[in-house]
């Protein structure tokens, strides 16, 4: 029999129908809304946006937060390492609140901000405690959107990556390759390979002796990420909210390719994830083919949907601008276009 923490909370069917049939929370961008299923973020789905610092992850979160507040839904914003930019959010709300209405009917920005709850969770313990007790939140039935800004920071603080981690993984892969090669080798090469495996075993022993905590740290990090993923999946299933998570990228050195950026969270994070959007930029001042100059690279951002449901598959790169009034579409670039960025799209997949 499953314990109470592993059982989903039963909910009326009518509430589930109303939640999943409700319109999504848009980005004010047709390209991004289409990439997330046609109407933006939908309730019951976990979406992630990852990218290097300054790529516009928080700007996307602010945009959908403003649209969710304007729709009358309550929003919970979890801040980890930096406070929510309230002035930018207020500016987005002011730009969308009609100014031609009568004073009695006009929706005040402060009234909209009353629907926003900010939770400060600077470390992993705070994150886990908040997610485990999410069903005890006030106004639970009114919550439509959950934002977790920079989830990767608490994980990094709890289990920081180090060069020993990559050395351990590299040695483990090399040992596995040598073992498989030894099994399929011919008889005349058996003696030579056994000597190599003997040295490899000594290296493994020395490595384990000097880095006894490396494997434990890696396993604990993976377990923590898996726990967060399971808790978020439980929240979407029981509370019918849309979850939007922003994360950072990390560098990885690949033989023959060099350094590349990959999402920080490991592959077990993808099990319950519905959408993963990767942001990047191009530092170019070239003109487009039609002769029109492109916007400044400081405002223009590119995106690629690294994971999405098969029914929503879109093989294209997205380009949008970050402006003071919000997000604006620029263009959609097919992936087979001759104008490709320097780093391959596949290099961004974990």
Curated annotation (Swiss-Prot):
Cellular component GO terms, alphabetical: cytosol; nucleus; Rad51B-Rad51C-Rad51D-XRCC2 complex; Rad51C-XRCC3 complex; replication fork; site of double-strand break
**What would you give as a GO molecular function for this chain, any one?**
DNA binding
Listed Gene3D superfamilies: P-loop containing nucleotide triphosphate hydrolases
Keywords, in A-Z order: ATP-binding, DNA damage, DNA repair, Nucleotide-binding, Nucleus
- UniProt-annotated stretches for the region Disordered: 331-350
Biological processes annotated in GO: DNA damage response; DNA strand invasion; double-strand break repair via homologous recombination; meiotic DNA recombinase assembly; meiotic joint molecule formation; reciprocal meiotic recombination
- The entry's ATP-binding residues are 51-58
Compartmental location: Nucleus
Q: Which PANTHER family does the record cross-reference, listed alphabetically?
A: DNA REPAIR PROTEIN RAD51 HOMOLOG 3, DNA REPAIR PROTEIN RAD51 HOMOLOG 3 RAD51C
Q: What does this protein do?
A: Required for radiation resistance and meiotic viability and acts in recombination and recombinational DNA repair pathways.
Family named by the database record:
Belongs to the RecA family. RAD55 subfamily.
What is the protein name stated in its UniProt record?
A: DNA repair protein rhp55
What organism is the protein native to?
A: Schizosaccharomyces pombe (strain 972 / ATCC 24843) (Fission yeast)
Q: Which gene encodes it?
A: rhp55
């Amino acid at each position: 029999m499953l314990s109470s923490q592993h059982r989903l909370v039963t909910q009326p069917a009518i509430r589930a129908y109303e939640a999943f049939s409700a319109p999504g929370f848009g980005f004010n961008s047709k390209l991004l809304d289409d990439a997330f299923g046609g109407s933006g973020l939908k309730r019951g789905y976990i979406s992630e946006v990852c990218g290097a610092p300054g790529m516009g992850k928080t700007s996307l979160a602010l945009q959908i937060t403003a649209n969710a507040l304007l729709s009358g839904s309550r929003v919970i914003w979890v801040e980890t390492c930096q406070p929510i930019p309230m002035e930018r959010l207020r500016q987005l709300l002011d730009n969308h609140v009609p100014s031609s209405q009568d004073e009695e009917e006009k929706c005040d920005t402060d009234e909209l901000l009353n629907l926003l709850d900010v939770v400060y969770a600077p470390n992993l313990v705070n994150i886990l405690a908040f997610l485990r007790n999410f069903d005890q939140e006030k106004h639970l039935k009114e919550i439509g959107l959950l934002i977790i800004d920079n989830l990767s920071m608490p994980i990094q603080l709890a289990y920081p990556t180090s060069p020993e981690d990559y050395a351990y993984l590299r040695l483990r892969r090399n040992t596995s390759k040598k073992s498989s090669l030894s099994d399929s080798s011919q008889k005349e090469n058996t003696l030579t390979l056994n000597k190599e495996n003997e040295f490899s075993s000594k290296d493994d022993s020395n490595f384990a002796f000097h880095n006894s905590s490396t494997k434990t740290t890696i396993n604990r990090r993976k377990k923590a990420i898996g726990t967060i993923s399971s808790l978020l999946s439980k929240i979407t299933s029981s509370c019918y909210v849309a979850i939007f998570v922003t994360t950072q990228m990390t560098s990885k050195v690949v033989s023959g390719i060099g350094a590349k950026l990959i999402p920080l969270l490991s592959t077990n994070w993808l099990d319950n994830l519905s959408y993963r959007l990767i942001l990047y930029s191009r530092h170019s001042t070239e003109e487009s083919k039609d002769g029109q100059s492109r916007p400044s690279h400081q405002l223009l951002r590119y995106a690629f949907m690294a994971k999405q449901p098969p029914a929503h598959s879109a093989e294209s790169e997205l380009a949008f601008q970050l402006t003071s009034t919000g997000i604006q579409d620029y263009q959609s670039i097919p992936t087979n276009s001759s104008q490709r960025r320097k780093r391959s799209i596949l290099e961004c997949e974990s």
